[in-house]
Amino acid sequence: MSEQNNNEMSFQIQRIYTKDVSFEAPNAPHVFQKDWQPEVKLDLDTASTQLADDVYEVVLRVTVTASLGEETAFLCEVQQGGIFSVGGIEGNQLAHCLGAYCPNILFPYARECITSLVSRGTFPQLNLAPVNFDALFMNYLQQQAGEGTEEHQDA
């Protein structure tokens, strides 16, 4: 009976926190004198670390770079962390939980932090669209499978 209880799936958020924040406006103040038609680039990255049995830290790194031509208007990076208890999940399900489900939870916090920093830099409001981490995770798995196939073909 206790074996069955140990295999039950469980998920709990222990903590969500800001791990690192950076905001740079290297070409201020003269960048404020230009027409605001920026090219905005969004980079996302996730990393997970096992802290204890069934306890994981997941860190979502979101970097936003806004450029006007060749000049960087601002560069904003947020590392949003979370500590999650994940029990009864292994293998691909655990990888999906840490690589997609947890980042989906963390992203709204990172987005709010970035929006606030950009606003404090007196730049026009930046609204980041929701991100489909499930699709990104599936793309990652497909890339990994493709690389594994290429390695076997080269051998």
Curated annotation (Swiss-Prot):
Keywords: Chaperone, Cytoplasm, Protein transport, Translocation, Transport. Its main location: cytoplasm. InterPro entries: SecB, SecB-like_sf. One of its GO terms (biological process) is protein transport. GO terms for molecular function: unfolded protein binding. GO terms for cellular component: cytoplasm. It holds the Pfam family SecB. It comes from the Bacteria. It is found in: Cytoplasm. Homotetramer, a dimer of dimers. One homotetramer interacts with 1 SecA dimer. Belongs to the SecB family. One of the proteins required for the normal export of preproteins out of the cell cytoplasm. It is a molecular chaperone that binds to a subset of precursor proteins, maintaining them in a translocation-competent state. It also specifically binds to its receptor SecA. NCBIfam families: PRK05751.1-1 (NF004390), PRK05751.1-4 (NF004393), secB (TIGR00809). This is Protein-export protein SecB. It comes from Enterobacter sp. (strain 638). The gene is secB.
